Amino acid sequence: MSITSEKKKNLINTYAIKEDDTGSSFVQCAILTERISNLTEHFKVHKHDHHSKRGLLILIGRRRKHLNYIKRKFGDEAYQQLIEKLGIRK
C-alpha cells in the first residue's frame, strides 16, 4: 500500500517545479494520487477494510485542498494541466 522510495523519487522528478522541489503542491498532489490509487487497488480485494477507507477519505480531502490551492494560486490552466497529467478527472 505504501509507495517505494524509487517511485516517490520518480514522481518528485516528474512534477517538480525546480531542481530541489520536494514539497510543492504539484509534487504533493502527485504523491497523494499514487497513494490513493494504491489504496483503491487494495479495496478491490479487501472490501470490508473500513479503517483504511477512512484513511483514503483523508488522503482525498488533502489532495482536494492542494488542488484548490493550485487553482487559486496558479490559475485554471495549471490546474487543468495537472489533473490531465495525473489522470484524475474524466
From Swiss-Prot:
The keyword Iron does not apply. One of its GO terms (biological process) is translation. The keyword rRNA-binding applies. One of its GO terms (cellular component) is cytosolic small ribosomal subunit. Pfam families: Ribosomal_S15 (PF00312). GO terms for molecular function: rRNA binding; structural constituent of ribosome. Keywords: Ribonucleoprotein, Ribosomal protein, RNA-binding, rRNA-binding. One of the primary rRNA binding proteins, it binds directly to 16S rRNA where it helps nucleate assembly of the platform of the 30S subunit by binding and bridging several RNA helices of the 16S rRNA. This is Small ribosomal subunit protein uS15. It comes from Wolbachia sp. subsp. Brugia malayi (strain TRS). The lineage of its organism: Bacteria, Pseudomonadati, Pseudomonadota, Alphaproteobacteria, Rickettsiales.
